[in-house]
């Protein structure tokens, strides 16, 4: 499959870094969700007669919901940070290429700076 062009964000190094960051953020979010679910469950058990009378399955669902919600929200927040940093670095790289080309007397179109790479 020679000649396939893939965007730079398919770079294995970038994908590995993103996977690591999202995994760490998900674990932190899950821990925060667990702390919140435990604290709120204790308060609900103390003050809510409805919560005291629900079955174990409902309580487990309540805890799982908070844990997963914490993990998802934290991972999404980390993804947005990663994208912002990635595009900022990409913009700096493009500006550097444009400046170097201008110093040499070459004037490149912004389209020619696409950060695509070909796979061989």
Swiss-Prot record:
Glycosylation site list: 114
Membrane-spanning residues: 22-44
Domain of life: Eukaryota
Gene Ontology cellular-component annotations: membrane
Topology relative to the membrane: Single-pass membrane protein
Recorded coiled-coil stretches: none
Entry keyword set: Glycoprotein, Membrane, Transmembrane, Transmembrane helix
Keyword Glycoprotein set for record: yes
Location within or outside the cell: Membrane
Keyword Membrane (UniProt): yes
Protein name: Uncharacterized protein YBR255C-A
Organism lineage: Eukaryota, Fungi, Dikarya, Ascomycota, Saccharomycotina
């Amino acid at each position: 499959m020679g000649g396939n062009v893939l965007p730079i964000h398919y770079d294995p190094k970038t994908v590995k870094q993103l996977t690591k960051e999202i995994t760490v953020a998900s674990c932190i979010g899950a821990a925060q969700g667990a702390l919140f679910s435990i604290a709120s469950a204790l308060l609900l058990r103390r003050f809510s007669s409805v919560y005291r009378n629900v079955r174990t399955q409902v309580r487990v669902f309540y805890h799982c919901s908070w844990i997963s919600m914490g993990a998802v929200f934290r991972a999404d927040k980390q993804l947005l940070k990663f994208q912002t940093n990635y595009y900022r670095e990409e913009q700096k790289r493009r500006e550097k290429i444009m400046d170097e080309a201008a110093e040499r007397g070459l004037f490149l179109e912004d389209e020619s700076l696409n950060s695509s790479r070909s796979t061989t």
